[in-house]
Amino acid sequence: VTIPDPATPQSPPPDDDTGALSERASTASGGSGADTADDGTGSGNAGASTGRGGRRARRTWLGRLAVLAVLAMVAGCVPFLWVLSSTSDHRHTAGAVPERAVALVLGAGVRPDGRPSLLLARRLDAAADLYFAGRVDVVLVTGDNSVEHYNETDTMRAYLVDAGVPGEHVVGDYAGFSTWDSCVRAHEVFGVREATVVTQDFHLPRAVRLCRSAGIDAVGVADSSLEERTFATVYGWFREVPAAVAALGSVVLRPDPTFLGDYESGVDEALALEREPGAAGG
């Protein structure tokens, strides 16, 4: 048996802790890789979450816009239905309309060559028929003459005279810049207290409503001759929805017309004249 010399340094026996440390280091290294892998997965999940969040936000805004669109349609339809219902008893056919002293014809555009637009010509034809049938005695034509080379009123008057209506029974209002302006001026400037409003069927409910709100005992006769023109008719009715909202505002707020002016006696003077023999019935 060899007895080790105490003076000779001895190598330490293998330490199991060294192996454990190596294993822990290896494990830590592996864990770091796993963590790195997890970090990559987390970034991907974050991107996916952001994409889903963006889609949800877009869907939310689209939903809100859809709700607002529906509310706007409802808000527009309520005044439109009010205009229709409040004038249902005051709109008549030409053969059944009550007699009124004055026919009020609303302007509707003039062509560049000076002729009335199709809409306006049909309104004037209907007014002439009422005059010849003895349903009205005077025709008040109201239109836009805000610029020098555009004159709805003179065009309307000339058309009626050419159709056989005596010129002295046609009175012109040159400041009818809107339906509301025309109604207020007919009442305040020309002294009209009752009238038959003549316009297209889609415009008639609003026109009668505004004239009645302006103080005129108004009834209406519609020109329906454009019903075969589907696009024009649909467009006309469609635009009346927002126009009814504006009409409600006029009825509530009662704004002054663009131009009011002094009293004009043209209607009074025309009513004082006797009809020419044979004028009724054309």
Residue ranges, per PLM feature:
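N-terminal type II signal-anchor transmembrane helix
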Residues: 51-95
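A structural signal for short, hydrophobic/glycine-enriched beta-strand patches
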Residues: 2-9, 82-238
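Intrinsically disordered, low-complexity terminal tails and inter-domain linkers enriched
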Residues: 5-56
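Structural motif marking the loop-to-transmembrane transition
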Residues: 47, 54, 58-62, 230, ...
